[in-house]
Amino acid sequence: MQRILSSSLIAIAALASLAAHGQTATVQDAWVRATVPQQKATGAFMKITAARPMKLVGVKSPAAPVAEIHEMRLQDNVMKMRPVDKLDLPAGQAVELKPGGYHVMLMDLPKPVKAGDTVPLQLVLEGADGQRQTIDVQASVRALGTTGTNAPAQDAPAHAGHGAHQH
């Protein structure tokens, strides 16, 4: 119980700090999965916490001509991936973009993304008032086969098949 209360107080303090500095969202633990030669797509993952209700409505990156918000969902006992127009970011709640769930797809990669590199991302957020803002993020590139915690991934090949992803 004390851990929950402590975590809640930290979240409230962080949101108050955001509001005081005019920021509307923070991004934590942003990372991109490294690619293998000839692979033309990969995933980007992170935690986004908005100070007020917002939506993630777009992503841009100089590393990829095409960047989209995607969702993985179990449908008829098959994992399916599809692009989504937006992702709701409730006020004060961390929304995790992770392998096997919501994530950013970086597609048509002109060159491999190597572990240890950094990939710049620009997130486009929209408030309830229709106002848009961008957040610049530097995502670290992690080796193929890792998850957000740097542990070996059980689903490491999941994004490897996106190399032939077509739109």
Feature locations, PLM:
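N-terminal signal peptide c-region/cleavage motif recognized by signal peptidases
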Residues: 14-22
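Bacterial N-terminal signal peptides that target proteins for export
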Residues: 1-9
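Compact, glycine-rich, soluble single-domain proteins
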Residues: 24-167
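Absolute protein N-terminus
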Residues: 1, 21-24
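Compositionally biased, intrinsically disordered low-complexity segments
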Residues: 7, 13-15, 138
